[in-house]
């Protein structure tokens, strides 16, 4: 056998070997073990052949990092889940299509637990929530983009229960109300942007109840006086509400 012939067979063998490797590796994708449970690397695709998700299973359980993609793009995953090897929990991050973090928190069997945080497009903190078994629990905090607190609301069993406060973007309290099972119930107070009390009264099961007090510049006024005062625009001209639909 000539040197040229030997070289031909060697190159042919090497080429076949490397050509075989991807095919061999491909066979290990989307496999089941002897117990008919998913094992190893799994990849799923949308009907347009874009990747839907990629991750790894061990005896049917997700482990490590799973990446989920939107049907419109494969540039950046819209969800990344970091699964624990020793429990059913996963650290979950949601992203915009261009890769900006939207929210993050922990899930256990697809239910939110513990602290979850949400973000403005510029990365600033927008909201903080706490969950127990998939339901809101404890104090929710929403923020303005300048970092000031916008809202503080107490939740129990997934519903508003207890005090709820709202603030201006300068930190001034403008609303303080109470809830019972998602309905306004109890004392209610509303304030001007100056911080002066504007009106106060009581709610019963979502409706105003009894006598409400009204204030202008900290001075108590009648409901009629309050209504007349609200007809004035900032420049002092009267404004008929009936003309607002023009």
Indicate residue ranges for each PLM-predicted region.
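Glycine/tyrosine- and acidic-biased, solvent-exposed loop/turn segments at the edges of beta-strands
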Residues: 20-246
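Bacterial Sec-dependent N-terminal signal peptides
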Residues: 1-29
């Amino acid at each position: 056998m000539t040197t040229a012939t030997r070289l031909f067979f060697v190159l042919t063998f090497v080429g076949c070997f490397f050509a075989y490797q991807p095919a061999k590796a491909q066979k290990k994708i989307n496999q089941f073990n002897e117990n008919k449970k998913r094992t190893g690397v799994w990849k799923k695709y949308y009907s347009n052949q874009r990747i839907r998700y990629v991750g790894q299973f061990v005896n049917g359980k997700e482990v490590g990092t799973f990446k989920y993609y939107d049907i419109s793009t494969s540039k950046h995953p819209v969800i990344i889940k970091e699964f624990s090897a020793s429990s059913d929990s996963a650290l979950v991050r949601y992203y915009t299509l261009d890769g900006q973090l939207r929210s993050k928190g922990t899930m256990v069997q697809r239910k939110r637990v513990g602290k979850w945080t949400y973000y403005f497009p510029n990365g600033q903190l927008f909201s903080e929530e706490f969950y127990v078994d998939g339901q809101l629990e404890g104090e929710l905090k929403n923020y303005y983009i300048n970092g000031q607190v916008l809202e503080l609301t107490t939740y129990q069993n997934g519903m508003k229960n207890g005090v709820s406060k709202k603030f201006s973007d300068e930190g001034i309290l403008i609303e303080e109300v109470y809830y019972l099972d998602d309905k306004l119930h109890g004392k209610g107070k509303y304030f001007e942007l100056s911080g002066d009390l504007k009106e106060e009264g009581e709610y019963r099961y979502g409706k105003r109840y009894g006598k409400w007090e009204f204030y202008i510049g900290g001075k108590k006024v009648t409901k009629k006086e309050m209504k007349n005062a609200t007809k004035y625009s900032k420049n002092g001209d009267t404004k008929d509400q009936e003309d607002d639909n023009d």
